[in-house]
Amino acid sequence: MTQQTQQPEVNIGLVGHVDHGKTTLVQALSGSWTDQHSEEMKRGISIRLGYADATFRMISNINPPEGYTVDETGPDGEPTETLRTVSFVDAPGHETLMATMLSGAAIMDGAVLVVSATEDVPQAQTEEHLMALDIIGIENVVIAQNKIDLVDRERAIESHNQIQSFVEGTVAEDAPIVPVSAQQAVNIDLLIDAIEREIPTPERDADTSPRLYAARSFDINRPGTTWKNLSGGVIGGSVSRGRLETGAEIELRPGREVDQGGQVEWQPIITDVRSLQAGGESVSEVTPGGLCGVGTGLDPSLTKGDSLAGQIVGEPGTLPPTRESFTMTVELLDRVVGDEAGEVETISTGEPLMLTVGTATTVGAVTSARSGEAEVSLKRPVCAEEGSKIAINRRVGARWRLIGIGTLE
């Protein structure tokens, strides 16, 4: 298998309510591909990113959908044909982690909405995640009706009908609903078939200057490592365009906070690419699509604990501006999604909002609010270009709730 085939080429989000089986489904789809390459970097990414790569394959003498598999050999021991490798982004289903799901959505090309057949539809986060996909504009959706092994036929049909009426009028209205059991690996072939049809690999420009969205960052050194053996900090994310190569000089924006004689300002970080990982392999270059790990020359204390998540990475001098405030056009939802479902009131001056721009989440205070427009001053700046989509969350009770979408002017 060539390195090119092995590299993931598309990012698929797994979204849905907590405990509906997203992580178990990832395990079923990853098949016999386990941690064969347990290098430190990959260990770090898979722990932090909540992601797994899966290679979809075809058994040559069996027609689809039954011929789809994730196994390297068919029933008679014959090798299977590789179709493509995909990266699954496992978005947290817990409501307090909604910001993480939104920042993950920035690097998704499509999504599998996982809904448990054992519970009524919709549960709170199922609804909130679907609304987030709608808002961010992820149109390629497949629905996995999970845990069918735990219900009888009548309940499975009732659940299917509930899902159908729930997605009516949303981005997932025409999405196929595939009944599966992640635990028993039932109908995984049908799910792969639906993903292959509904979530194609998008066309991307690999010949322009590279752009990577950082979704995670970490220190891969074990406690007690001597300074001679220290590895540089690692960034995990997705290349949206161009090629990233080992040895390349890179810039990170908005960078880091620096105290300049009592004045705090944000300065870009310049470093170099020391190593790259994609599809579980060390590679010399990463092309768009899929998730990758970038080993850098940065002090690992700068990258530990996701402290560089939300940065944009590229060639020095090619990145969008760093913004400490911006104006956005605002489109509000009709109602607040979640438990305290109520009408969304207009945004008012002085109110705090949680904003997700790309993979960056920040809090901003509204300095001016007009009809369909708001100016915000950010607590932590973002690097973003005009036209970027912004997920807007408001504090409702003790929680942040999704209330609308902004477009950066």
UniProtKB/Swiss-Prot annotation:
Residue numbers binding GTP: D19, H20, G21, K22, T23, T24, N146, K147, I148, D149, S181, A182, Q183
Which UniProt keywords are listed? Answer: GTP-binding, Hydrolase, Initiation factor, Magnesium, Metal-binding, Nucleotide-binding, Protein biosynthesis
GO molecular function terms listed in the Swiss-Prot or TrEMBL record:
GTP binding; GTPase activity; metal ion binding; translation elongation factor activity; translation initiation factor activity; tRNA binding
Q: Residues annotated as region G2? A: 44-48
Residues binding Mg(2+) 2 are D19, G44
Q: Which GO terms describe its cellular component?
A: cytosol
Q: Which GO terms describe its biological process?
A: formation of translation preinitiation complex
Task: Indicate the segments forming the tr-type G domain, all copies.
Answer: 7-203
Q: Which domain of life is it from?
A: Archaea
- Subunit note: Heterotrimer composed of an alpha, a beta and a gamma chain.
Alphabetized HAMAP family for the sequence = eIF_2_gamma
Physiological role: eIF-2 functions in the early steps of protein synthesis by forming a ternary complex with GTP and initiator tRNA.
User: What's this protein's family per the entry?
Assistant: Belongs to the TRAFAC class translation factor GTPase superfamily. Classic translation factor GTPase family. EIF2G subfamily.
UniProt-recorded name of the protein: Translation initiation factor 2 subunit gamma
> What lineage does the source organism belong to?
Archaea, Methanobacteriati, Methanobacteriota, Stenosarchaea group, Halobacteria
